[in-house]
A protein has these predicted regions:
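Conserved N-terminal phosphate-binding loop of PLP-dependent enzymes in the Aspartate aminotransferase
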Residues: 1-241
Length: 241
């Protein structure tokens, strides 16, 4: 209904909510969004900064989302501050048509981060060595090796906790899988989370210090993954969960 008036130029979205835990989209939601935006002539822009872990082509590529614009932040350069954007050939043609109708001129972009040599080197290295099928294969396998035993661990103890995975990124929460940010926030248990993180730190293991998010690195070993699962199980035994 919000798009029906035809006065909304674009919808900018992240395919997975990740700043309040990981909230996966419901089946069919993103496909419906694409269909509705096309019907009303609204452009669709996807931000993959937090979902590039899905694979070399990001979440959009893995799920055939077909956005009009694709943007990504520091993840594409291995964590170094960076941003890129791209668009379809149809959008390019529309841009060129607009430019052709205008007087000739010049434009440019000159900012503190523009043309940074370190950023460009990091981006090149990441594109050549990180965002490839060969590199992602062990990352995805490691994520599955982590996610499946964790879910089994919770089920064996009768805990209604969930495990979410977005490619090489895994997260678990202390409740059934949330459908929105409000449900994710309501399910947070800060004291339990802090106790778990401290338990792991004291045993030489560290996870992201907000939420229970883990990202499998290309060089992550199976032994390290298994040790993490084992210590989470030991923690649950210690606190009688």
């Amino acid at each position: 209904a919000a798009l029906a008036a035809g006065d909304i130029a674009a919808v900018l979205y992240e395919p997975v909510m990740t700043n309040i835990g990981m909230v996966l989209p419901e089946a069919g939601y993103l496909g419906a969004l694409r269909e509705i935006t096309r019907r009303h002539g609204t452009l669709l822009i996807i931000d993959e900064t937090h979902t590039l872990s899905s694979g070399p082509a990001g979440y959009a590529g893995e799920h055939a989302l077909q956005p009009d614009f694709w943007v990504c932040g520091k993840a594409i350069a291995g964590g170094v501050p960076c941003a890129v954007y791209g668009f379809t050939s149809e959008i390019e043609a529309r841009m060129r048509a607009v430019l052709a109708s205008r007087e000739a001129g010049h434009s440019g972009m000159g900012t503190t981060l523009a043309g940074n040599a370190l950023t460009l080197a990091a981006l090149e290295a990441a594109l050549l060595h990180l965002h490839t099928s060969a590199t992602h294969a062990p990352m995805q396998a490691g994520a599955r090796r982590l996610a499946m035993p964790l879910q089994a661990l919770f089920a064996a103890r009768g805990l209604p906790w969930h495990v979410s995975r977005v490619g090489a990124r895994v997260e678990f929460g202390f409740a059934p899988a949330p459908r929105n940010g409000s449900e994710a926030e309501a399910a947070m248990r800060p004291v339990l989370e802090q106790a778990l993180h401290l338990w792991l730190l004291n045993r030489g293991l560290i996870v992201t210090p907000f939420h229970n998010m883990m990202l499998i690195a290309p060089m992550q070993t199976n032994d390290a993954i298994d040790a993490l699962v084992s210590e989470i199980g030991a923690f649950l035994d210690e606190v009688s969960l």
